[in-house]
Amino acid sequence: MVTAHGAVRVKRAYYYCGRCHQSFLPYDDAVGLVDEISPGLRPLVCLAGTLAPFADAAEDVLKRFSGVRLSASTVLRTTEGEGERLRAQLKDGRMVEPAQAEPFWTKPRDDGQPAAYVGLDAFSVPMQGLRAGKAEHRMLYAALLYTPDKEHTRYLVDFELNTLAEQVRAQAGAVGIEQVSQLIAVTDGGNGLEEALQRQLAANLTTVLDWYHAAEHLCAFAKVWLGADEPACVAWQHEAKGVLYERGGDALLAHLRGLDLPPGTSAEVREEYRKLVGYFEHNRHRTDYPTYRANGWDIGSGPTEAGCKIIGERLKGSGMRWVEDGAATVAALRALYVSGGPVWDGFWSQPHRLAA
């Protein structure tokens, strides 16, 4: 057995049942030994595999951490195995309990402030095709549950949007937030994000459209309509964003419908105008920015975008290509790690259950 202090020879009882043809190793079950890596070393191996590419983790990071020498394939196998165990646990609705109490999730908030914000977005993962060839990127969804002061965050990931939204609900309950009315979701206009959260949490979940995402749509239209380098383009962007920020989505829609596009306006501009109006009509219920700001609510999804980058950087290194299961398991451990030391430690202190 390989431990943090080097290789150790372990003698333990081995039993075999001639009737059921099953072997039994009681010592292994008692200490959580699943292969040659000791239970004490496994968290360190997985931490290295979560922080760095497997070869770097084995040849540099792990060796510097502990002096232990393992092959890259061993680090890969151990990291993905524990990541799969974590994924199985989360899909079963069993959230990881932190190693120490976290009362900040349920402490009283200022008037109008939510117990937590919910963020949901996706980022692309480079995939490997047949015979080690390139394949299309796949979108991996990342969800966040974070306190209003941004000091505490839980991260979750999955390739399946509905599965991830279910885990958000379970995670909110696990930290003591029982009422959906205590949550506010801030997302961009990505297809299906708001709907998935409303299906799995509640249809009346309060949702806010990311202000910067909405403003980008106004800027994009202005560039097509007036020309990116024209003073009129900058002036109209400033005016339209001011209407949205100070008066909200209903006022902006009235402003947009009042635009006088001359008869010679190109088909491209008219189509972009149609899409812009449709976008704000679809999202008008979550663009009341004056009220949100008066309540002291967040109107930007910066924490979620940052979370996608923090998790995604482990999957997007130079030359990296992933199979789906490998990406999902490593991303799950990465999300657990960046959720904070108490949660990471809590996972390793659990009784070891093999993934089904």
How would you describe each model-predicted region?
Residues M1-A13:
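N-terminal juxtadomain amphipathic helix
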